[in-house]
Amino acid sequence: MSEMSVVEYEVVSKNLTSKMSHELLFSVKKRWFVKPFRHDRQLGKLHYKLLPGNYIKFGLYVLKNQDYARFEIAWVHVDKDGKIEERTVYSIETYWHIFIDIENDLNCPYVLAKFIEMRPEFHKTAWVEESNYSIAEDDIQMVESIKRYLERKIASD
């Protein structure tokens, strides 16, 4: 029986004067955001140790001075040999002032609101909240509900 390998994976997490990059991993198995094992404030990175499995990477990239925001969802697969495959499945661009208000919208999917809420503070990295519960919907339903919500939200504004 082969031993499962743990893989190190890093994402960007920084909030500077004019731009912000915010990425977090979501565990498909545990149905909640993965807690990073290390925060690197100097480089603006979060470091994860991942077991083989499937993850969803949420990404938010902002140019504050230009009122621009891009949100992405990517599937991340770690195989038993430690090889990582990543594929972007959704991307949308909008105004930053619209996106920042989403976390206060009662119609916003819970996971999206939590992702926005956990964005990094000024000159810090994001802090992932631990949770004693997981979301009820499966990964595909969750991604589809986020996509539908954002398409409606951005079309209406």
Swiss-Prot record:
Origin: domain of life: Viruses
One Pfam family of this chain: DUF3258
Family matches, as InterPro entries: DUF3258
Protein name per the record: Uncharacterized protein ORF157
Organism: Acidianus filamentous virus 1 (isolate United States/Yellowstone)
